[in-house]
Amino acid sequence: MTAPNIEMIASSLRNCSLNGGGGGGGGRRRGRRAAAAEGSDDSEGVTVELNSEVALPYHWEQCLDIRTGQVYYINWEDGTRTTIDPRSSSAYSPSPASRSASSSSRRCSRARGRGGGGGAAAAASTTTSSGYTSVSSVGAVTAAAAAWRSHDSSGHGYGYGSYGYGYGYDGRDGDDEESSSSSSSSSSSSSASSSRGSAVSSTLSSFSPTDESASGAGSGYAVGDNGAHVLVAAGCRACFMYFMVPKTADVCPKCGSSGLLHLSRNGYV
């Protein structure tokens, strides 16, 4: 039995193809390579100039249409779309003044919308024929902003002045609210005290001007000329309140009920 020829087997394996004969498979591969080379030849020489070394204005955006390969630009301030590069336009000069002008024009338009500083805002900005806004007076813009802030503080109050909390930019609203609340509380207290009437007046009648002046001196005692009146702490059984009353008083100065419990160091007296 003769041994197999290894070289013949190796050559047959090299020419073998799973898609058919060896020659046919190699031809198809060569055809695909040729088509790819032709496609690459067609795309060669097609370039798109992006001008990346010069920055676009901040409200412009550069876009590329994938289907047509065309570069276009969108102005997000007014929504316009154009194929003209705004950097190559003679009307545009890439300086900070144009950006400040646009921001100033937006502030002025907001001020006109709120009703404050309309004339100053109109004098503050001018529009050129190319559509860009330039600032003619910085002081006018400042005046418009001040008028806008004053309109907000007086008309809206940021949730303080208009609701009467007393903490807003205009403190008069809070003062009016406090005065109205104090007047209402005083009227209610006067009506309540008139109902108690005679009992409270009889209790307070025991004080004299000399007693009040002596107690205001901080001595703790309402001492008259003869030292007969002494202030003590007393508790009311009805309203559960403690008061400083004369030692001889037996009526609550708040509710008018009798039977005050006078307190001393050792307890009740």
From Swiss-Prot:
Span list, region Disordered:
17-44, 83-133, 174-218
Intervals of motif EAR = 47-52
Record field: compositional bias (Polar residues): 203-212
Q: Where is the composition biased (Low complexity)?
A: 87-106, 121-133, 180-202
**Keywords of this entry:** ATP-binding, Helicase, Hydrolase, Nucleotide-binding
GO MF annotation: an example: helicase activity
Keyword check for Hydrolase, yes or no.
yes
User: What SUPFAM superfamilies does the annotation carry?
Assistant: WW domain
Q: Which residues form the WW domain?
A: 54-88
Asked if the record carries the keyword Chloroplast, the reply is no
Q: What does this protein do?
A: Negatively regulates the cuticle development probably by interacting with the HD-ZIP IV transcription factor HDG1.
Assembly information from the UniProt record: Binds to HDG1.
Q: Identify this protein by name.
A: Protein CURLY FLAG LEAF 1
- Species source reads Oryza sativa subsp. indica
Gene name? CFL1
